[in-house]
Amino acid sequence: MSHRDTLFSAPIARLGDWTFDERVAEVFPDMIQRSVPGYSNIISMIGMLAERFVQPGTQVYDLGCSLGAATLSVRRNIHHDNCKIIAIDNSPAMIERCRRHIDAYKAPTPVDVIEGDIRDIAIENASMVVLNFTLQFLEPSERQALLDKIYQGLNPGGALVLSEKFSFEDAKVGELLFNMHHDFKRANGYSELEISQKRSMLENVMLTDSVETHKARLHQAGFEHSELWFQCFNFGSLVALKAEDAA
């Protein structure tokens, strides 16, 4: 059962850096719905993309799976035999709850839920890979290597879905979308104190990139095609395609 997010409703003397611990896992569904504009749309559309890209006898990777929302969306839309989903997260609290969520929804496609570091996982025989608000928590110097590994592990014609919070090269646009995002959180019941304290905890942990930076990395990894398919304020999602004739 999910609870309402009140983690930062009272002043916290020593905030520290953000961690996906048991307290966060307990309120995560409420937190992300009230904090990330368009999150439900992204999750449902990931399922539609899976229906288009997942092929028989292949694997799907959900890297940084949290509670398994994207995994479940993919699973509901796989209509082929001999497919498998591999869902990975490095948070024990998230993985424990993810396993419960996956087990609660029976479907023919098996799911391996793994507690581990996505940087250490081999990507093999993949028709689709999902990075749903995950890359932004890696050190910027480590992001290209992960995208390179994903590209190498994707089969020709495969797809990567990359959802992120964005920064903007145009400072005026960045300020507008930043403020609109804060308006969104206020409209969803978060106080100024809650918004401020959460931002302080995240600022050294979640380091955002521009869409242009993401596209440049994807191109360097080998993806011939990439485009922003969804955006709401400073949050969005790209899809990157490996050519069908790729070696």
Swiss-Prot record:
Record InterPro entries: CmoA, Methyltransf_25, SAM-dependent_MTases_sf
Superkingdom, taxonomy of origin: Bacteria
Keyword S-adenosyl-L-methionine (UniProt): yes
Coiled coil: none
Residue spans crossing the bilayer: none
Gene Ontology annotations of biological process type: tRNA wobble uridine modification
Swiss-Prot/TrEMBL keywords: S-adenosyl-L-methionine, Transferase
Gene Ontology terms, MF aspect: carboxyl- or carbamoyltransferase activity; S-adenosyl-L-methionine binding
Catalytic activities: prephenate + S-adenosyl-L-methionine = carboxy-S-adenosyl-L-methionine + 3-phenylpyruvate + H2O
PANTHER family associated with the record: CARBOXY-S-ADENOSYL-L-METHIONINE SYNTHASE, TRANS-ACONITATE 2-METHYLTRANSFERASE-RELATED
Family: Belongs to the class I-like SAM-binding methyltransferase superfamily. Cx-SAM synthase family.
Function according to Swiss-Prot or TrEMBL: Catalyzes the conversion of S-adenosyl-L-methionine (SAM) to carboxy-S-adenosyl-L-methionine (Cx-SAM).
Quaternary state and interactors: Homodimer.
Protein name per its UniProtKB record: Carboxy-S-adenosyl-L-methionine synthase
Protein species of origin: Escherichia fergusonii (strain ATCC 35469 / DSM 13698 / CCUG 18766 / IAM 14443 / JCM 21226 / LMG 7866 / NBRC 102419 / NCTC 12128 / CDC 0568-73)
Gene name, Swiss-Prot/TrEMBL: cmoA
